[in-house]
Amino acid sequence: MGDIFLCKKVESPKKNLRESKQREEDDEDPDLIYVGVEHVHRDAEVLFVGMISNSKPVVSNILNRVTPGSNSRRKKGHFRQYPAHVSQPANHVTSMAKAIMPVSLSEGRSTDSPVTMKSSSEPGYKMSSPQVVSPSSSDSLPPGTQCLVGAMVSGGGRNESSPDSKRLSTSDINSRDSKRVKLRDGIPGVPSLAVVPSDMSSTISTNTPSQGICNSSNHVQNGVTFPWPDANGKAHFNLTDPERASESALAMTDISSLASQNKTFDPKKENPIVLLSDFYYGQHKGDGQPEQKTHTTFKCLSCVKVLKNIKFMNHMKHHLEFEKQRNDSWEDHTTCQHCHRQFPTPFQLQCHIDSVHIAMGPSAVCKICELSFETDQVLLQHMKDHHKPGEMPYVCQVCHYRSSVFADVETHFRTCHENTKNLLCLFCLKLFKTAIPYMNHCWRHSRRRVLQCSKCRLQFLTLKEEIEHKTKDHQTFKKPEQLQGLPSETKVIIQTSVQPGSSGMASVIVSNTDPQSSPVKTKKKTAMNTRDSRLPCSKDSS
Protein backbone atom coordinates (compact mmCIF):
# COMPACT_ATOMS: atom_id res chain seq x y z
CA MET A 1 0.00 0.00 0.00
CA GLY A 2 2.84 2.33 0.78
CA ASP A 3 4.56 1.51 -2.53
CA ILE A 4 1.43 2.37 -4.49
CA PHE A 5 1.08 5.71 -2.76
CA LEU A 6 4.74 6.47 -3.48
CA CYS A 7 4.24 5.65 -7.17
CA LYS A 8 1.32 8.01 -7.35
CA LYS A 9 3.41 10.77 -5.86
CA VAL A 10 6.16 10.12 -8.41
CA GLU A 11 3.73 10.03 -11.36
CA SER A 12 2.03 13.33 -10.42
CA PRO A 13 5.15 15.48 -11.07
CA LYS A 14 5.61 13.77 -14.43
CA LYS A 15 2.03 14.52 -15.32
CA ASN A 16 2.48 18.16 -14.37
CA LEU A 17 5.62 18.25 -16.48
CA ARG A 18 3.74 16.93 -19.51
CA GLU A 19 1.00 19.55 -19.04
CA SER A 20 3.56 22.36 -18.92
CA LYS A 21 5.24 21.01 -22.05
CA GLN A 22 1.90 20.79 -23.83
CA ARG A 23 1.08 24.34 -22.73
CA GLU A 24 4.41 25.57 -24.12
CA GLU A 25 3.78 23.79 -27.40
CA ASP A 26 0.41 25.50 -27.64
CA ASP A 27 2.01 28.87 -26.95
CA GLU A 28 4.47 28.32 -29.79
CA ASP A 29 1.71 27.86 -32.38
CA PRO A 30 1.26 31.55 -33.45
CA ASP A 31 2.34 32.06 -37.00
CA LEU A 32 4.42 35.12 -36.39
CA ILE A 33 7.95 33.85 -35.71
CA TYR A 34 10.05 36.96 -35.96
CA VAL A 35 9.45 40.58 -36.54
CA GLY A 36 12.63 42.39 -37.42
CA VAL A 37 13.82 45.73 -38.64
CA GLU A 38 15.61 45.57 -41.94
CA HIS A 39 17.34 48.45 -43.64
CA VAL A 40 16.37 47.94 -47.24
CA HIS A 41 17.76 51.19 -48.59
CA ARG A 42 20.21 53.05 -46.35
CA ASP A 43 20.40 56.09 -48.61
CA ALA A 44 16.71 56.83 -48.14
CA GLU A 45 16.81 55.70 -44.47
CA VAL A 46 13.81 53.44 -44.88
CA LEU A 47 12.65 51.44 -41.89
CA PHE A 48 10.89 48.20 -42.79
CA VAL A 49 9.12 45.88 -40.46
CA GLY A 50 8.50 42.71 -42.43
CA MET A 51 7.76 39.02 -42.12
CA ILE A 52 10.57 36.56 -42.76
CA SER A 53 9.41 33.32 -44.35
CA ASN A 54 12.63 31.34 -43.78
CA SER A 55 12.25 31.38 -40.02
CA LYS A 56 14.09 28.96 -37.80
CA PRO A 57 12.29 26.65 -35.36
CA VAL A 58 11.85 27.86 -31.84
CA VAL A 59 14.24 26.24 -29.38
CA SER A 60 12.57 25.16 -26.19
CA ASN A 61 14.28 26.17 -22.98
CA ILE A 62 12.91 23.12 -21.23
CA LEU A 63 15.22 20.09 -21.50
CA ASN A 64 16.95 21.79 -24.52
CA ARG A 65 14.50 20.05 -26.82
CA VAL A 66 13.32 21.35 -30.19
CA THR A 67 9.60 21.40 -30.62
CA PRO A 68 8.90 18.80 -33.26
CA GLY A 69 6.85 19.62 -36.28
CA SER A 70 6.77 23.36 -35.73
CA ASN A 71 8.69 24.24 -38.88
CA SER A 72 6.82 21.85 -41.13
CA ARG A 73 3.46 22.90 -39.73
CA ARG A 74 4.20 26.54 -40.47
CA LYS A 75 5.40 25.85 -44.00
CA LYS A 76 2.27 23.86 -44.73
CA GLY A 77 0.04 26.46 -43.13
CA HIS A 78 -0.85 29.99 -44.01
CA PHE A 79 2.18 30.78 -46.13
CA ARG A 80 1.19 28.27 -48.77
CA GLN A 81 -2.37 29.53 -48.75
CA TYR A 82 -1.26 33.11 -49.42
CA PRO A 83 1.74 32.93 -51.73
CA ALA A 84 1.28 36.52 -52.85
CA HIS A 85 2.17 37.77 -49.39
CA VAL A 86 5.46 35.88 -48.93
CA SER A 87 8.21 38.41 -48.46
CA GLN A 88 10.96 38.62 -51.04
CA PRO A 89 14.71 38.41 -50.41
CA ALA A 90 16.63 41.23 -48.81
CA ASN A 91 17.09 43.20 -52.02
CA HIS A 92 13.32 43.33 -52.66
CA VAL A 93 10.49 45.10 -50.88
CA THR A 94 7.36 43.35 -49.70
CA SER A 95 4.53 44.15 -52.06
CA MET A 96 1.74 44.20 -49.46
CA ALA A 97 2.05 46.36 -46.37
CA LYS A 98 -0.12 48.31 -44.04
CA ALA A 99 0.90 51.63 -42.54
CA ILE A 100 0.95 51.74 -38.74
CA MET A 101 2.56 54.53 -36.81
CA PRO A 102 5.05 53.56 -34.08
CA VAL A 103 4.28 54.82 -30.66
CA SER A 104 7.39 56.99 -30.57
CA LEU A 105 6.49 58.60 -33.90
CA SER A 106 2.76 58.88 -33.34
CA GLU A 107 3.27 60.74 -30.09
CA GLY A 108 5.44 63.38 -31.79
CA ARG A 109 2.98 64.05 -34.64
CA SER A 110 -0.32 65.80 -34.64
CA THR A 111 -3.46 63.76 -35.03
CA ASP A 112 -4.36 65.40 -38.32
CA SER A 113 -1.02 64.77 -40.02
CA PRO A 114 -1.05 62.22 -42.84
CA VAL A 115 0.84 58.94 -42.53
CA THR A 116 2.08 57.52 -45.82
CA MET A 117 3.63 54.15 -46.53
CA LYS A 118 5.27 53.63 -49.86
CA SER A 119 7.73 51.29 -51.43
CA SER A 120 10.77 52.28 -53.40
CA SER A 121 10.10 53.23 -56.99
CA GLU A 122 13.70 52.98 -58.14
CA PRO A 123 14.42 50.73 -61.11
CA GLY A 124 16.65 48.43 -59.03
CA TYR A 125 13.74 47.13 -56.99
CA LYS A 126 11.23 44.59 -58.25
CA MET A 127 7.93 43.57 -56.84
CA SER A 128 6.38 40.20 -57.49
CA SER A 129 2.71 41.15 -57.26
CA PRO A 130 1.95 44.82 -56.51
CA GLN A 131 -1.64 45.16 -55.42
CA VAL A 132 -3.91 47.02 -53.03
CA VAL A 133 -5.46 45.10 -50.19
CA SER A 134 -9.19 45.54 -50.40
CA PRO A 135 -11.51 45.07 -47.44
CA SER A 136 -12.77 41.74 -48.80
CA SER A 137 -9.33 40.25 -49.24
CA SER A 138 -8.16 41.45 -45.86
CA ASP A 139 -11.04 39.72 -44.12
CA SER A 140 -10.03 36.37 -45.57
CA LEU A 141 -6.52 36.64 -44.20
CA PRO A 142 -5.69 35.11 -40.84
CA PRO A 143 -5.32 37.44 -37.89
CA GLY A 144 -1.61 36.80 -37.67
CA THR A 145 -1.04 37.80 -41.26
CA GLN A 146 -3.17 40.92 -40.97
CA CYS A 147 -1.00 42.16 -38.13
CA LEU A 148 2.19 42.05 -40.19
CA VAL A 149 3.10 45.63 -40.88
CA GLY A 150 5.67 47.33 -43.08
CA ALA A 151 6.18 50.81 -41.75
CA MET A 152 8.50 52.88 -43.87
CA VAL A 153 9.51 56.39 -42.89
CA SER A 154 11.39 58.31 -45.56
CA GLY A 155 14.15 60.41 -43.99
CA GLY A 156 15.82 61.73 -47.12
CA GLY A 157 12.69 63.02 -48.83
CA ARG A 158 13.41 61.33 -52.16
CA ASN A 159 10.68 59.73 -54.25
CA GLU A 160 8.09 61.39 -52.10
CA SER A 161 5.37 60.93 -54.64
CA SER A 162 4.51 58.78 -57.57
CA PRO A 163 1.67 59.43 -60.01
CA ASP A 164 0.63 55.78 -60.10
CA SER A 165 0.29 55.33 -56.33
CA LYS A 166 -2.97 53.80 -55.06
CA ARG A 167 -4.46 54.77 -51.72
CA LEU A 168 -7.01 53.45 -49.33
CA SER A 169 -9.11 55.67 -47.15
CA THR A 170 -8.93 55.77 -43.36
CA SER A 171 -12.27 54.04 -43.01
CA ASP A 172 -10.96 50.97 -44.86
CA ILE A 173 -8.12 50.61 -42.36
CA ASN A 174 -10.08 51.35 -39.21
CA SER A 175 -12.79 48.84 -40.14
CA ARG A 176 -10.32 46.04 -39.51
CA ASP A 177 -8.88 47.32 -36.22
CA SER A 178 -10.84 44.72 -34.25
CA LYS A 179 -9.07 41.86 -36.09
CA ARG A 180 -5.55 43.06 -35.45
CA VAL A 181 -3.34 41.53 -32.77
CA LYS A 182 -0.99 43.50 -30.55
CA LEU A 183 2.63 42.42 -31.06
CA ARG A 184 4.02 44.53 -28.29
CA ASP A 185 3.43 42.04 -25.47
CA GLY A 186 4.44 38.80 -27.21
CA ILE A 187 7.72 39.59 -28.94
CA PRO A 188 10.71 40.84 -26.97
CA GLY A 189 13.28 43.13 -28.53
CA VAL A 190 10.87 44.52 -31.14
CA PRO A 191 9.78 48.18 -31.02
CA SER A 192 6.24 48.52 -29.80
CA LEU A 193 3.68 49.22 -32.49
CA ALA A 194 0.34 50.94 -32.11
CA VAL A 195 -2.66 50.93 -34.37
CA VAL A 196 -3.46 54.29 -35.97
CA PRO A 197 -6.45 55.90 -34.23
CA SER A 198 -9.61 56.37 -36.18
CA ASP A 199 -9.46 60.15 -35.95
CA MET A 200 -5.99 60.28 -37.48
CA SER A 201 -5.75 61.01 -41.19
CA SER A 202 -3.72 58.12 -42.62
CA THR A 203 -2.95 56.97 -46.11
CA ILE A 204 -1.85 53.57 -47.38
CA SER A 205 -0.21 53.41 -50.77
CA THR A 206 1.69 50.80 -52.73
CA ASN A 207 3.79 52.08 -55.56
CA THR A 208 4.61 50.17 -58.68
CA PRO A 209 8.07 50.59 -60.20
CA SER A 210 8.05 53.73 -62.34
CA GLN A 211 10.48 56.16 -63.84
CA GLY A 212 8.46 59.36 -63.63
CA ILE A 213 5.72 58.35 -66.14
CA CYS A 214 2.14 58.23 -64.98
CA ASN A 215 0.63 54.87 -65.94
CA SER A 216 -2.69 54.97 -64.09
CA SER A 217 -5.51 57.22 -65.18
CA ASN A 218 -6.84 58.05 -61.71
CA HIS A 219 -6.18 57.62 -58.02
CA VAL A 220 -8.41 57.01 -55.02
CA GLN A 221 -8.33 59.27 -51.99
CA ASN A 222 -10.86 59.24 -49.15
CA GLY A 223 -13.21 57.16 -51.26
CA VAL A 224 -13.33 59.65 -54.15
CA THR A 225 -11.66 59.06 -57.50
CA PHE A 226 -9.61 61.92 -58.92
CA PRO A 227 -8.10 61.88 -62.41
CA TRP A 228 -4.34 62.18 -62.64
CA PRO A 229 -3.03 65.15 -64.66
CA ASP A 230 -1.68 64.45 -68.12
CA ALA A 231 1.98 64.21 -68.88
CA ASN A 232 1.94 67.81 -70.12
CA GLY A 233 0.05 69.05 -67.07
CA LYS A 234 1.32 70.04 -63.69
CA ALA A 235 3.12 67.48 -61.58
CA HIS A 236 1.29 66.04 -58.56
CA PHE A 237 3.24 66.27 -55.32
CA ASN A 238 2.47 64.03 -52.35
CA LEU A 239 4.72 65.07 -49.51
CA THR A 240 5.13 62.55 -46.72
CA ASP A 241 6.19 65.00 -44.02
CA PRO A 242 3.44 67.53 -43.23
CA GLU A 243 5.97 70.04 -41.90
CA ARG A 244 7.95 69.89 -45.13
CA ALA A 245 4.70 70.07 -47.05
CA SER A 246 3.71 73.28 -45.28
CA GLU A 247 7.18 74.77 -45.75
CA SER A 248 7.22 73.92 -49.45
CA ALA A 249 3.71 75.30 -49.84
CA LEU A 250 4.78 78.55 -48.23
CA ALA A 251 7.85 78.68 -50.44
CA MET A 252 5.75 78.12 -53.55
CA THR A 253 3.34 80.83 -52.41
CA ASP A 254 6.15 83.31 -51.83
CA ILE A 255 7.66 82.60 -55.25
CA SER A 256 4.32 82.97 -56.99
CA SER A 257 3.58 86.20 -55.16
CA LEU A 258 6.97 87.58 -56.15
CA ALA A 259 6.33 86.60 -59.75
CA SER A 260 2.97 88.32 -59.72
CA GLN A 261 4.54 91.37 -58.22
CA ASN A 262 7.16 91.31 -60.92
CA LYS A 263 4.47 91.21 -63.60
CA THR A 264 2.43 94.02 -62.20
CA PHE A 265 5.51 96.12 -61.27
CA ASP A 266 6.48 98.89 -63.77
CA PRO A 267 10.32 99.03 -64.13
CA LYS A 268 10.24 102.58 -65.55
CA LYS A 269 10.31 105.43 -63.10
CA GLU A 270 7.48 107.91 -62.96
CA ASN A 271 7.82 111.24 -64.71
CA PRO A 272 9.19 113.90 -62.34
CA ILE A 273 6.78 116.66 -61.32
CA VAL A 274 8.15 120.21 -61.51
CA LEU A 275 6.48 123.49 -60.62
CA LEU A 276 5.81 125.95 -63.41
CA SER A 277 7.82 128.67 -61.65
CA ASP A 278 10.83 126.37 -61.27
CA PHE A 279 10.68 125.06 -64.82
CA TYR A 280 10.15 128.24 -66.86
CA TYR A 281 11.19 131.15 -64.61
CA GLY A 282 14.61 132.06 -63.28
CA GLN A 283 17.21 134.74 -62.57
CA HIS A 284 20.86 135.26 -63.36
CA LYS A 285 22.92 137.72 -61.29
CA GLY A 286 25.27 138.63 -64.11
CA ASP A 287 28.75 139.99 -63.52
CA GLY A 288 28.06 140.92 -59.93
CA GLN A 289 30.46 143.90 -60.03
CA PRO A 290 28.94 147.19 -58.79
CA GLU A 291 29.08 150.10 -61.22
CA GLN A 292 31.00 153.21 -60.26
CA LYS A 293 28.78 156.02 -58.93
CA THR A 294 29.36 159.11 -61.11
CA HIS A 295 26.32 161.14 -59.98
CA THR A 296 25.86 162.34 -63.55
CA THR A 297 23.02 164.84 -64.14
CA PHE A 298 20.67 165.08 -67.12
CA LYS A 299 18.74 168.14 -68.34
CA CYS A 300 15.12 167.94 -69.63
CA LEU A 301 14.50 169.96 -72.85
CA SER A 302 10.80 170.55 -72.10
CA CYS A 303 10.96 171.91 -68.52
CA VAL A 304 14.71 172.59 -68.27
CA LYS A 305 15.09 170.46 -65.14
CA VAL A 306 18.41 168.87 -64.24
CA LEU A 307 18.10 165.44 -62.63
CA LYS A 308 20.15 162.34 -62.01
CA ASN A 309 19.60 159.22 -64.05
CA ILE A 310 16.81 157.51 -62.05
CA LYS A 311 14.87 160.70 -61.38
CA PHE A 312 15.31 161.80 -64.98
CA MET A 313 13.79 158.48 -66.16
CA ASN A 314 10.74 159.02 -63.91
CA HIS A 315 10.43 162.59 -65.12
CA MET A 316 10.38 161.48 -68.73
CA LYS A 317 7.70 158.91 -67.93
CA HIS A 318 5.41 161.61 -66.55
CA HIS A 319 5.88 163.64 -69.72
CA LEU A 320 4.72 160.74 -71.85
CA GLU A 321 1.61 160.13 -69.75
CA PHE A 322 0.69 163.80 -69.87
CA GLU A 323 1.10 163.78 -73.63
CA LYS A 324 -1.35 160.88 -73.97
CA GLN A 325 -3.97 162.57 -71.81
CA ARG A 326 -3.75 165.76 -73.81
CA ASN A 327 -4.19 164.11 -77.17
CA ASP A 328 -7.16 162.05 -75.95
CA SER A 329 -6.93 159.57 -78.80
CA TRP A 330 -8.50 156.12 -79.02
CA GLU A 331 -5.14 154.50 -78.67
CA ASP A 332 -4.58 156.22 -75.37
CA HIS A 333 -7.74 154.65 -73.97
CA THR A 334 -6.74 151.15 -75.11
CA THR A 335 -3.03 151.16 -74.15
CA CYS A 336 -1.84 149.82 -70.80
CA GLN A 337 0.13 152.39 -68.82
CA HIS A 338 2.11 149.61 -67.07
CA CYS A 339 3.31 147.44 -69.92
CA HIS A 340 2.42 149.75 -72.85
CA ARG A 341 0.53 146.96 -74.56
CA GLN A 342 -2.43 148.00 -76.69
CA PHE A 343 -5.81 146.22 -76.50
CA PRO A 344 -8.86 146.32 -78.82
CA THR A 345 -11.26 147.90 -76.32
CA PRO A 346 -10.98 149.84 -73.04
CA PHE A 347 -12.89 147.05 -71.27
CA GLN A 348 -10.27 144.50 -72.23
CA LEU A 349 -7.60 146.92 -71.09
CA GLN A 350 -9.23 147.27 -67.70
CA CYS A 351 -9.56 143.50 -67.32
CA HIS A 352 -5.89 143.16 -68.18
CA ILE A 353 -4.89 145.70 -65.55
CA ASP A 354 -7.05 144.10 -62.87
CA SER A 355 -5.80 140.56 -63.47
CA VAL A 356 -2.14 141.21 -64.21
CA HIS A 357 -0.86 144.40 -62.65
CA ILE A 358 -3.06 144.89 -59.58
CA ALA A 359 -4.19 141.32 -58.89
CA MET A 360 -4.46 140.64 -55.17
CA GLY A 361 -4.58 136.83 -55.29
CA PRO A 362 -3.00 134.14 -57.44
CA SER A 363 -4.21 134.08 -61.02
CA ALA A 364 -3.35 132.33 -64.26
CA VAL A 365 -0.81 134.88 -65.48
CA CYS A 366 2.28 134.35 -67.59
CA LYS A 367 5.07 136.33 -65.93
CA ILE A 368 7.15 136.46 -69.08
CA CYS A 369 4.66 138.04 -71.46
CA GLU A 370 2.35 139.43 -68.72
CA LEU A 371 -0.87 138.00 -70.12
CA SER A 372 -3.70 136.49 -68.13
CA PHE A 373 -5.58 133.29 -69.00
CA GLU A 374 -8.88 131.79 -67.98
CA THR A 375 -7.61 128.62 -66.31
CA ASP A 376 -4.34 127.11 -65.19
CA GLN A 377 -4.59 124.47 -67.89
CA VAL A 378 -4.68 127.14 -70.60
CA LEU A 379 -1.72 128.85 -68.95
CA LEU A 380 0.30 125.62 -68.94
CA GLN A 381 -0.47 125.01 -72.60
CA HIS A 382 0.61 128.57 -73.40
CA MET A 383 3.91 128.06 -71.60
CA LYS A 384 4.51 124.83 -73.48
CA ASP A 385 3.79 126.37 -76.89
CA HIS A 386 5.54 129.74 -76.54
CA HIS A 387 8.28 129.47 -73.92
CA LYS A 388 11.28 127.33 -73.14
CA PRO A 389 12.64 126.05 -69.81
CA GLY A 390 14.76 128.64 -68.03
CA GLU A 391 13.87 131.39 -70.49
CA MET A 392 15.10 134.86 -69.35
CA PRO A 393 14.37 137.42 -72.07
CA TYR A 394 14.83 140.56 -69.95
CA VAL A 395 18.49 141.57 -69.76
CA CYS A 396 20.35 144.43 -68.16
CA GLN A 397 22.85 145.71 -70.74
CA VAL A 398 25.16 147.09 -68.07
CA CYS A 399 25.94 144.02 -65.93
CA HIS A 400 24.10 141.30 -67.92
CA TYR A 401 21.65 140.62 -65.16
CA ARG A 402 18.81 138.46 -66.52
CA SER A 403 15.36 137.48 -65.38
CA SER A 404 12.11 136.01 -66.62
CA VAL A 405 10.17 138.93 -65.15
CA PHE A 406 10.43 142.49 -66.44
CA ALA A 407 9.85 144.01 -63.00
CA ASP A 408 12.97 142.27 -61.67
CA VAL A 409 15.22 143.94 -64.24
CA GLU A 410 13.65 147.35 -63.66
CA THR A 411 14.08 147.03 -59.89
CA HIS A 412 17.65 145.84 -60.38
CA PHE A 413 18.57 148.86 -62.48
CA ARG A 414 16.98 151.32 -60.04
CA THR A 415 18.83 149.85 -57.06
CA CYS A 416 22.17 148.75 -58.50
CA HIS A 417 22.77 151.41 -61.19
CA GLU A 418 21.46 154.47 -59.40
CA ASN A 419 23.52 157.73 -59.69
CA THR A 420 25.40 156.44 -62.71
CA LYS A 421 25.76 157.76 -66.28
CA ASN A 422 23.33 155.27 -67.82
CA LEU A 423 19.69 155.78 -68.78
CA LEU A 424 17.34 152.84 -69.38
CA CYS A 425 14.44 152.78 -71.86
CA LEU A 426 11.48 151.09 -70.18
CA PHE A 427 10.00 150.07 -73.56
CA CYS A 428 12.89 148.01 -74.99
CA LEU A 429 15.58 148.06 -72.23
CA LYS A 430 17.99 149.96 -74.41
CA LEU A 431 20.79 152.00 -72.75
CA PHE A 432 21.63 155.67 -73.36
CA LYS A 433 24.33 157.91 -71.89
CA THR A 434 22.96 161.33 -72.87
CA ALA A 435 19.60 163.03 -72.31
CA ILE A 436 18.67 164.19 -75.85
CA PRO A 437 18.88 160.79 -77.63
CA TYR A 438 17.07 159.22 -74.74
CA MET A 439 14.17 161.71 -74.89
CA ASN A 440 13.82 161.36 -78.70
CA HIS A 441 13.79 157.58 -78.40
CA CYS A 442 11.04 157.69 -75.78
CA TRP A 443 8.92 160.11 -77.87
CA ARG A 444 9.12 157.76 -80.82
CA HIS A 445 7.84 154.86 -78.70
CA SER A 446 4.78 156.87 -77.73
CA ARG A 447 3.96 158.61 -81.02
CA ARG A 448 4.51 156.00 -83.70
CA ARG A 449 3.36 152.43 -84.16
CA VAL A 450 5.81 150.06 -82.48
CA LEU A 451 6.60 146.35 -82.98
CA GLN A 452 5.35 144.30 -80.08
CA CYS A 453 7.27 141.13 -79.26
CA SER A 454 4.93 138.15 -79.39
CA LYS A 455 6.70 136.40 -76.49
CA CYS A 456 7.22 139.22 -73.97
CA ARG A 457 6.17 142.79 -73.17
CA LEU A 458 9.06 144.54 -74.95
CA GLN A 459 8.39 146.85 -77.89
CA PHE A 460 10.86 147.73 -80.62
CA LEU A 461 11.08 150.51 -83.15
CA THR A 462 12.62 148.39 -85.90
CA LEU A 463 12.08 144.84 -87.07
CA LYS A 464 15.79 144.15 -86.86
CA GLU A 465 15.82 144.85 -83.14
CA GLU A 466 12.82 142.61 -82.62
CA ILE A 467 14.38 139.69 -84.52
CA GLU A 468 17.67 140.04 -82.68
CA HIS A 469 15.82 140.06 -79.41
CA LYS A 470 13.86 136.89 -80.24
CA THR A 471 16.94 135.10 -81.50
CA LYS A 472 19.21 135.90 -78.55
CA ASP A 473 16.97 136.39 -75.55
CA HIS A 474 14.09 133.94 -76.03
CA GLN A 475 16.20 130.81 -75.57
CA THR A 476 17.01 128.55 -72.66
CA PHE A 477 19.64 130.50 -70.77
CA LYS A 478 19.93 128.27 -67.73
CA LYS A 479 18.64 124.73 -67.40
CA PRO A 480 16.42 124.23 -64.34
CA GLU A 481 18.02 122.42 -61.43
CA GLN A 482 15.32 119.74 -61.48
CA LEU A 483 16.36 118.72 -65.02
CA GLN A 484 20.09 118.51 -64.41
CA GLY A 485 21.33 114.94 -64.72
CA LEU A 486 18.23 113.69 -66.54
CA PRO A 487 18.49 112.32 -70.09
CA SER A 488 17.27 114.51 -72.91
CA GLU A 489 14.28 112.31 -73.75
CA THR A 490 12.86 112.47 -70.22
CA LYS A 491 9.24 113.62 -69.96
CA VAL A 492 8.46 116.12 -67.20
CA ILE A 493 5.05 116.89 -65.70
CA ILE A 494 4.52 120.63 -65.17
CA GLN A 495 2.02 121.86 -62.59
CA THR A 496 1.15 125.28 -61.22
CA SER A 497 1.37 123.94 -57.65
CA VAL A 498 2.12 120.64 -55.96
CA GLN A 499 -0.41 119.63 -53.32
CA PRO A 500 -0.82 116.11 -51.86
CA GLY A 501 -4.00 114.36 -52.91
CA SER A 502 -4.82 116.77 -55.75
CA SER A 503 -5.43 114.32 -58.58
CA GLY A 504 -7.44 116.74 -60.72
CA MET A 505 -4.79 119.47 -60.76
CA ALA A 506 -3.93 121.03 -64.11
CA SER A 507 -0.72 119.65 -65.59
CA VAL A 508 1.10 119.28 -68.88
CA ILE A 509 3.86 116.90 -70.00
CA VAL A 510 6.90 118.58 -71.54
CA SER A 511 10.08 117.09 -72.96
CA ASN A 512 13.34 117.81 -71.22
CA THR A 513 14.78 119.56 -74.28
CA ASP A 514 12.58 121.29 -76.81
CA PRO A 515 13.66 121.24 -80.47
CA GLN A 516 15.60 124.31 -81.47
CA SER A 517 15.21 126.11 -84.77
CA SER A 518 17.78 125.43 -87.44
CA PRO A 519 20.56 128.04 -87.68
CA VAL A 520 20.29 128.18 -91.47
CA LYS A 521 16.58 128.98 -91.40
CA THR A 522 17.13 131.60 -88.73
CA LYS A 523 19.75 133.38 -90.78
CA LYS A 524 17.58 133.41 -93.90
CA LYS A 525 14.61 134.71 -91.97
CA THR A 526 16.73 137.38 -90.31
CA ALA A 527 18.14 138.57 -93.61
CA MET A 528 14.73 138.75 -95.25
CA ASN A 529 13.17 140.60 -92.34
CA THR A 530 16.10 142.98 -92.21
CA ARG A 531 15.65 143.84 -95.89
CA ASP A 532 11.95 144.47 -95.40
CA SER A 533 12.55 146.55 -92.32
CA ARG A 534 14.66 149.02 -94.25
CA LEU A 535 11.74 150.16 -96.41
CA PRO A 536 9.75 152.01 -93.74
CA CYS A 537 12.92 153.61 -92.47
CA SER A 538 13.69 155.08 -95.90
CA LYS A 539 10.17 156.54 -96.20
CA ASP A 540 10.41 158.15 -92.80
CA SER A 541 13.78 159.58 -93.58
CA SER A 542 12.49 161.09 -96.80
From Swiss-Prot:
<dbReference type="GO" id="GO:0000978">
    <property type="term" value="F:RNA polymerase II cis-regulatory region sequence-specific DNA binding"/>
</dbReference>
<keyword id="KW-0805">Transcription regulation</keyword>
<protein>
    <recommendedName>
        <fullName>Zinc finger protein 280A</fullName>
    </recommendedName>
</protein>
<comment type="function">
    <text>May function as a transcription factor.</text>
</comment>
<dbReference type="InterPro" id="IPR036236">
    <property type="entry name" value="Znf_C2H2_sf"/>
</dbReference>
<dbReference type="GO" id="GO:0006355">
    <property type="term" value="P:regulation of DNA-templated transcription"/>
</dbReference>
<keyword id="KW-0539">Nucleus</keyword>
<feature type="region of interest" description="Disordered">
    <location>
        <begin position="66"/>
        <end position="185"/>
    </location>
</feature>
<feature type="zinc finger region" description="C2H2-type 4">
    <location>
        <begin position="451"/>
        <end position="474"/>
    </location>
</feature>
<dbReference type="GO" id="GO:0005634">
    <property type="term" value="C:nucleus"/>
</dbReference>
<dbReference type="Pfam" id="PF13836">
    <property type="entry name" value="DUF4195"/>
</dbReference>
<feature type="zinc finger region" description="C2H2-type 1">
    <location>
        <begin position="334"/>
        <end position="357"/>
    </location>
</feature>
<dbReference type="InterPro" id="IPR013087">
    <property type="entry name" value="Znf_C2H2_type"/>
</dbReference>
<feature type="zinc finger region" description="C2H2-type 2">
    <location>
        <begin position="364"/>
        <end position="387"/>
    </location>
</feature>
<keyword id="KW-0863">Zinc-finger</keyword>
<feature type="compositionally biased region" description="Basic and acidic residues">
    <location>
        <begin position="161"/>
        <end position="185"/>
    </location>
</feature>
<dbReference type="InterPro" id="IPR025243">
    <property type="entry name" value="DUF4195"/>
</dbReference>
<keyword id="KW-0804">Transcription</keyword>
<feature type="compositionally biased region" description="Low complexity">
    <location>
        <begin position="128"/>
        <end position="143"/>
    </location>
</feature>
<dbReference type="InterPro" id="IPR050527">
    <property type="entry name" value="Snail/Krueppel_Znf"/>
</dbReference>
<keyword id="KW-0862">Zinc</keyword>
<keyword id="KW-0238">DNA-binding</keyword>
<feature type="compositionally biased region" description="Polar residues">
    <location>
        <begin position="499"/>
        <end position="520"/>
    </location>
</feature>
<feature type="compositionally biased region" description="Polar residues">
    <location>
        <begin position="107"/>
        <end position="122"/>
    </location>
</feature>
<dbReference type="GO" id="GO:0000981">
    <property type="term" value="F:DNA-binding transcription factor activity, RNA polymerase II-specific"/>
</dbReference>
<dbReference type="GO" id="GO:0008270">
    <property type="term" value="F:zinc ion binding"/>
</dbReference>
<feature type="region of interest" description="Disordered">
    <location>
        <begin position="499"/>
        <end position="542"/>
    </location>
</feature>
<keyword id="KW-0677">Repeat</keyword>
<feature type="zinc finger region" description="C2H2-type 3">
    <location>
        <begin position="423"/>
        <end position="445"/>
    </location>
</feature>
<keyword id="KW-0479">Metal-binding</keyword>
